[in-house]
């Protein structure tokens, strides 16, 4: 593309028009038009692609309108939006606003026990991000389609709480951690350690409290439902049906949400979901509460297991590590993979579903931004970083001379890539 500003503006403006036209045509074809755009993973491929292109083009056009002063202004706004959402979550405003109908600011402030003027200020800033809306008579507030979903979906509620109670405080200690421990790779010398004044690793901290364990597991489940991390990308990244009735070991599989998605799409596969005992107990209960068909649940079993211990399931078709190894430094990542090697059968594969960092500017900025965000989140919580393909290859070569990354695939619109590792 021509790098002249006029050419770039013309390019992205035409993409907005073309993409929006296709999306509008799809919306008008529906019997009941939704109030928000459906996830790009739940619509026809062409429409999903148009949504991705629209987001990227709009993002780039917005960038062109900002001079340095505007950039700093927007950063200030973004910080205050985050602060406002955290405030609204802390005082349970999302759950206190009725899912249907509206409530006055006066009554809401009384129920929440917060000053009415502060409540109004926080909600009205959130409204600029399509969270809440004023409805009916002056002084009445109601849910927007987005905030209603954030209030009613239990996994999104957990994600919101995790963001407010853990992610935000940790990020504020990023500078302090680097100043205190420059260059450290220790699992207990992180921004999270400073934010919560503890001396173990992040996962030690989580495992010490069952409530933290459940909140973290539920938030990870919620993340997997967003379009960029949707489990449907994993379903499309490999010919799973070629495994027949093989066993997939879902290591660190938390609530089993990934195995459930695969089981629903591939009716012959069987699954063993492994995680820490507290997580397993909660996950079994959640699976029972979901009342899924027996054709799905009878093919999924849970097993307490530590990633660093030898893999007890022998000869499985696939050992799946989805968003697991990025939480661990290279040494421990190698140890986890080595724990699988003795269990491998002649045709067994190891699947790593994780971010593969691209060259700067080589993919859409809306996708790269999320990858770079995750890169820093990992550093702040676990003193690790996301990896490039060369980093992944170096780790696999340290595990065994007989293992190779044979295939790497990133489904369009996905943040995660699938790395297929086989014995050679």
From Swiss-Prot:
Disrupted gene: phenotype observed: Leads to the accumulatio of aurasperone B and fonsecin B.
Enzyme Commission number, as recorded: 2.1.1.-
InterPro entries in the cross-refs: COMT-like, O_MeTrfase_dom, SAM-dependent_MTases_sf, WH-like_DNA-bd_sf, WH_DNA-bd_sf
Active site: 326 (proton acceptor)
Any one of the GO BP annotations: secondary metabolite biosynthetic process
GO MF entry, a single one: O-methyltransferase activity
PROSITE patterns: SAM_OMT_II
UniProt pathway: Secondary metabolite biosynthesis
Entry superkingdom: Eukaryota
Keywords for this protein: Methyltransferase, S-adenosyl-L-methionine, Transferase
Binding-site residues, S-adenosyl-L-methionine: 275
Gene3D superfamilies: Vaccinia Virus protein VP39 (3.40.50.150), Winged helix-like DNA-binding domain superfamily/Winged helix DNA-binding domain (1.10.10.10)
Signal peptide: none
Keyword Mitochondrion in annotation: no
SUPFAM superfamilies: S-adenosyl-L-methionine-dependent methyltransferases, Winged helix' DNA-binding domain
Recorded family membership: Belongs to the class I-like SAM-binding methyltransferase superfamily. Cation-independent O-methyltransferase family.
Described function: O-methyltransferase; part of the gene cluster that mediates the biosynthesis of aurasperone B, a dimeric gamma-naphthopyrone. The first step in the biosynthesis of aurasperone B is the production of gamma-naphthopyrone precursor YWA1 by the non-reducing polyketide synthase albA, via condensation of one acetyl-CoA starter unit with 6 malonyl-CoA units.
Name used for this protein in its record: O-methyltransferase aunD
Taxonomic placement: Eukaryota, Fungi, Dikarya, Ascomycota, Pezizomycotina
Gene designation per UniProt: aunD
